[in-house]
Every structure is written in C-alpha cells, then in structure tokens.
Amino acid sequence: MAIKPKYIKQLGNVLLERYPDSFNTDFETNKDSVTTLTTVESKGVRNRIAGYVTQKKAQAAQKA
C-alpha cells in the first residue's frame, strides 16, 4: 500500500476534525461528502481524500 501525500492527509484530517458526522466507512458517501465540503476539482485527488477518510473511519471503528 502506497503512502499518501502530505496534502491528502492534512486535508483529510481537517475534514474529519471539522465534520466528523459527515463521514462513515462507505467510500461512495465519503466521496460525495468531500465534493460538497471542499473545492477540490480533480477527481483523482477527491477520491484519494475520500479513501483516506474511509480508511481512518474504518480504523476507528475497529478500535471501538
């Protein structure tokens, strides 16, 4: 698994901190949330952010 770039992690963490209820463990809904909450125009960057957020939510759910 590749290491995510710093800007993906930073933006993903900011989104999780500000809007924790907008995200869950489903990639498709997280993709829509990233689209509505940010101004990211690139589909690839949007998907990477959504994937990172999905991964973080899944890890948090496993620990709980």
Swiss-Prot record:
Q: What is the lineage of its organism?
A: Archaea, Methanobacteriati, Methanobacteriota, Stenosarchaea group, Halobacteria
Q: Mind telling me which NCBIfam families this protein's record contains?
A: PRK01151.1 (NF002242)
Task: Please give the name of this protein.
Answer: Small ribosomal subunit protein eS17
Protein species of origin: Halorubrum lacusprofundi (strain ATCC 49239 / DSM 5036 / JCM 8891 / ACAM 34)
* Keyword Ribosomal protein tagged: yes
A single Gene Ontology MF term assigned here is:
structural constituent of ribosome
- This protein's UniProt keywords: Ribonucleoprotein, Ribosomal protein
Task: Please indicate which superkingdom the organism of origin belongs to.
Answer: Archaea
Q: Name one GO cellular component term.
A: ribosome
Q: Which gene encodes it?
A: rps17e
What PANTHER family does this protein map onto? 40S RIBOSOMAL PROTEIN S17
The biological processes this protein is annotated with in GO are: translation
| Recorded family membership | Belongs to the eukaryotic ribosomal protein eS17 family.
SUPFAM superfamilies attached to this UniProt entry:
Rps17e-like
